[in-house]
Design a protein with these regions (language model features):
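Phosphate-binding glycine-rich loop
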Residues: 66-107, 125
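N-terminal "arm"/small-domain region of PLP-dependent enzymes with the aminotransferase-like
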Residues: 1-60
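PLP-dependent aminotransferase class I/II
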Residues: 45, 215-292, 297-299
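Active-site pre-lysine segment of PLP-dependent enzymes
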Residues: 142-151, 164-187, 191-223
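PLP-dependent enzyme catalytic core of the Aspartate aminotransferase-like
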Residues: 320-323, 327, 331-357
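PLP-dependent aminotransferase-like
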Residues: 100-158
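Conserved PLP-binding catalytic core of the aspartate aminotransferase-like
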Residues: 280-281, 290-324, 338
Length: 357
């Protein structure tokens, strides 16, 4: 039986996904310090955890519309609920974007390296990723992206701050970029890590959904600062016509009652969110300082991870770190998630050992 022949042509030509792939070796993460997937080691709000337990009794009931969580999110950002779409993580929303708006012959302009889900989105739906390298500062090269747009371009994607490079482009830069994108090209801005940013000019573009007459989609997730990666919860903010179109996807009905209730509780527990952010920022600064003292080049981070050049092969460093029972990530350079201080210190001690310092 040749299953490959049964696949769609788009899936046959799609390269292997890099989503969640961190090493060629299979690791038993249960025995390791997990610093490879940008997970929030502080977990979710205790209030959210309690609500999950309480709402489990409703797990036998459908919730077709997710009305309550949509209303809460809409109020938080100053929109109507018709501007909000809920998904099982922002990854599900990315998939919905592709199913709704992409087809054979379309191109998606984006920088690399970035979140691999966007590359998958293009290929799965018959489109082609038109890749522009990040600039020398490991930032999205917005200027080169504009030059790459042509008559085949259906969508442009900006991840800000970017994963895996941890860098950002200023609100002013992104707004100018959006102004210059042709009106028939959809603009997707993924703000998964924005809540970790401390730079004054690293801001959300949500307001542009109202202010500009352009097809702008803003993606948000509960997987990062809200610590709900395993719960699967995210949302999109866009013009109501875009939301209505995406709502026609089968995947638009994919979020459990427990996830919705937990998300509401998490949004209402800002004290816990501030606690997480404060500790992640401290850990980020600690790792940055220690790596620089070890002679590594560290790219300024506005996220929950640090991207750095240890002047050695990133895949080799990742495997060496695995021998120290620490799981880390790699792209063109190395990436380490920021955790509680004891985890950060274990990572630095392992780096000193590996680098012979």
């Amino acid at each position: 039986m040749n299953i490959n022949e049964l696949k769609t042509k788009a899936m046959q030509r799609k390269p292997a996904s890099k989503r969640a792939s961190q090493t060629g070796k299979k690791l038993d993460l249960s025995k390791m310090v997990r610093m490879n997937f940008n997970e929030n080691s502080y977990g979710m709000s205790p209030k959210a955890l309690e609500v999950i337990k309480e709402s489990a009794v409703m797990g036998n009931r459908y919730d077709f519309n997710a009305t309550e969580i949509k209303d809460v999110i809409a109020k938080k950002h100053g929109f109507d609920s018709s501007n909000v779409l809920i998904g099982a993580g922002s990854s599900a929303l990315i998939d919905m974007l592709g199913v709704t708006f992409l087809e054979d012959g379309d191109e998606v302009v984006l920088c690399m390296p970035t979140f691999a889900a966007f590359v998958d989105m293009a290929y799965v739906n018959g489109a082609t990723p038109k890749v522009v390298p990040v600039n020398e500062n490991q930032e999205f090269d917005l200027e080169a992206m504009l030059e790459a747009i042509d008559e085949k371009t259906k969508m442009v994607v900006v991840v800000n701050p970017n994963n895996p490079t941890s860098t950002y482009r200023s609100a002013g830069d992104i707004e100018e970029f959006i102004k210059k994108v042709p009106e028939n090209v959809m603009i997707v801005v993924d703000e998964a890590y924005l809540e970790y940013a401390t730079a004054p000019d690293c801001k959300s573009m949500i307001h542009l959904v109202k202010e500009m007459d352009k097809p702008i989609v803003i993606l948000k997730t509960f997987s990062k600062i809200y610590g709900m990666a395993g719960v699967r919860m995210g949302y999109a903010i866009a013009d109501s016509e875009i939301i209505a179109s995406m709502s026609g996807c089968p995947a638009a009905w994919n979020v459990s009652i427990m996830a919705q209730k937990a998300a509401i509780a998490a949004l209402n527990d800002q004290e816990f969110i501030e606690y997480v952010k404060e500790n992640i920022v401290k850990g980020r600064e600690y790792i940055t300082k220690e790596l620089e003292q070890l002679g590594c080049k560290v790219f300024p981070s506005q996220t929950s991870f640090v991207y750095f050049d240890a002047h050695r092969n990133p895949a080799k460093l990742m495997d060496e770190m695995a021998k120290e029972n620490i799981a880390m990530g790699a792209a063109e350079y190395s990436r380490i998630s920021v955790g509680p201080m004891e985890e950060n210190q274990l990572f630095i001690e392992a780096m000193k050992k590996i680098l012979g310092r």
